[in-house]
Regions:
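Extended, non-globular alpha-helical segments
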Residues: 1, 46, 56-60
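Generic structural signal for individual residues within well-ordered alpha-helical segments
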Residues: 10, 82-85
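Short, charged, surface-exposed hinge/linker loops at domain edges
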Residues: 15-55, 86-135
Length: 135
């Protein structure tokens, strides 16, 4: 894989973006730190299929439904499955925001980066489908 300097990246930005858009990973290196540009759809697919990304679980619970993500503090309730799903998507977004702001530094939350990236790259409809067992 090619790693370009920050200056080279800036000077060749159109080419760099076209390369990533074409599905070819391209890297940028600055002060010894490396990052990679990837096509969003491919990264989203990779994260969705990752064994590190647990699947939400839904259970009927007396007066309604509960949706939760095992090994995380993310959960939601609703009168029916649709309402619980909608509340869960909101909870996912809130967790992702909290993770970016502060939880990523906590040892018991740091490992949830695949989830946070998946949530950040997903639309509301993507997340609702994922909660319901889709991709």
């Amino acid at each position: 894989m090619t790693f370009l300097s920050y200056t080279d990246t800036r000077n060749r930005l159109r080419e760099v973006l076209d390369t990533a858009d074409g599905g070819v990973p391209i890297g940028i290196e600055r002060h010894g730190h490396r990052v990679v540009l990837l096509d969003l759809a491919r990264l989203h697919e990779l994260l969705a299929d990752s064994p590190r990304l647990r699947r939400p679980e839904a259970i009927a619970d007396g007066d309604g439904w509960s949706v939760f993500l095992p090994d995380t503090p993310i959960a939601a309730d609703g009168a029916d499955l649709d309402e619980a799903t909608e509340e869960f998507v909101v909870a996912l977004r809130e967790y992702a925001q909290d993770w970016v702001e502060r939880l990523r530094f906590a040892p018991n939350h740091a490992q949830h980066w695949p989830l946070v990236h998946f949530v950040s790259l997903s639309s509301h409809a993507d997340l609702a489908a994922w909660v319901r067992g889709g991709r």
